[in-house]
Curated annotation (Swiss-Prot):
Family the entry assigns: Belongs to the quinolinate synthase family. Type 3 subfamily.
E.C. code: 2.5.1.72
GO biological process, one term: 'de novo' NAD biosynthetic process from L-aspartate
Cofactor: [4Fe-4S] cluster
Enzyme class: transferase
Reactions this protein catalyses: iminosuccinate + dihydroxyacetone phosphate = quinolinate + phosphate + 2 H2O + H(+)
Record-given protein name: Quinolinate synthase
Binding-site positions, [4Fe-4S] cluster: C110, C230, C320
Pathway involvement of the protein, from the record: Cofactor biosynthesis; NAD(+) biosynthesis; quinolinate from iminoaspartate: step 1/1
Free-text function comment from the UniProt entry: Catalyzes the condensation of iminoaspartate with dihydroxyacetone phosphate to form quinolinate.
Amino acid sequence: MSILEQVQPIETMLPERYYTMSTEDMEKRVREIKEKMGKMLFIPGHHYQKDEVVQFSDAAGDSLQLAQVAASNKDAKYIVFCGVHFMAETADMLTTDDQVVILPDMRAGCSMADMADIEQTERAWKELTKLFGDTMIPLTYVNSTAAIKAFCGRNGGATVTSSNAKQMVSWAFTQKERLVFLPDQHLGRNTAYDLGIPLDKMAVWDPHTDSLEYDGDIEEIQVILWKGHCSVHQNFTVKNIESIRKNHPDMNIIVHPECCYEVVAASDYAGSTKYIIDMIESAPSGSKWAIGTEMNLVNRIIQQHPDKEIVSLNPFMCPCLTMNRIDLPHLLWALETIERGEEINVISVDKQVTTEAVFALNRMLERV
């Protein structure tokens, strides 16, 4: 079942009048509705969201953190999630049946999450089992669909975040000889390498050709990486780093581990969104930084730290296009429909999928 089949009802067309409203009028209406609804309304906002949206967020953070905060907010009947599909799915799975999770724009997806669908994954597991038998455990990045989390849950696996990936990969190897990591090959590769697993003991599963790509001995493969990636972090290159080293030799380079192995290896630091934020905050005044992550977040960090010289690692970087679909007009539209007693763009994950996906989430939460 696709996510669009799981969501009822579906509204994707923003009414015309929101295109003609001034920013001031929209901001005023959002404030009015937030004040009117009080604790009945909770708006989580991901770090990659636009400032025009983040300013109204009741909590800002990464995807799992926001889902957990939403789940702990029992007073909120409506959770208007300013993020992308898989984040809203996770929030729905962790909240109660009485709470309603709404995504302001149904087009706000995640290309990386969509790179691993359940049919491809089931087929891959079947083929890999022919090669490796019962020696594998699946781990999925939380940046994945509910169906993929459920797959991991029913096959003894778990979810991971960029913050706890090392802990969870280490745990996985106490369970089985081999790890299947999806959907982001780069986070999987960088994490495994950081734990001492050589590149020639890693393979890549291509879901489009149903083939395993590897250089070494197939019997020695320890990590099978799904051929997926983040389209934003894929755009940071070693050439970007070489340019910074040449033109700004005293500048620190910090990147997200969704960047490719070569970029992470050439950087000074690599870590999760929270790690990047904390590193910049704790850095001394006057320090210089080139950051390799999503542009909305980089711009926000620049604004928050005028005492430091901060640039994007890639000067031509664009924000995450799907994350950027959540804007002020869509946020206001979602809030006004709630105010009228209507519900649009509701995220509702199948009960069986939820049960199995929560197994995977809990296996992670119990260990970190």
